[in-house]
Amino acid sequence: MTTGAGRRLMLVAVVLATAAGCASYSAELRAGKRGEREAGLATYYSPRLAGHKTASGERYDPKQFTAAHPVIPFGTHVQVTRTDGTNRAVIVRVNDRCKGGRKIIDVSESAARQLDMLRVGIVPVELEVMAPPP
């Protein structure tokens, strides 16, 4: 049986772990400041999600160049560049949220096609904020 003090300690540990994860994003990236960069892995949306609502309230359209990111503001335009030697790049507009971690962005099917990642599913990328939200 867990004591009251044990429960409080567990709650504090969860809060600190969550805060530490959130703190890894700079204030500039959170604000969508032009020129901010981030490196990690990209994946793309399943075709089954077409028509589902995104976190911004828009419907996911696989034909649009959109993406999900944990903290970059909705409406921000971001260049996504593969860093595995292909240097393929695409500019997307953030309109959804994803969990983060090593996987930093989920892109639409059209953006994934432009990045030539449909067969592999996950690729290393660098993001650069191109234009802050309007």
Residue ranges and their predicted role:
Residues M1-M10:
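Bacterial N-terminal signal peptides that target proteins for export
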Residues M10-A20:
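Bacterial N-terminal signal peptides
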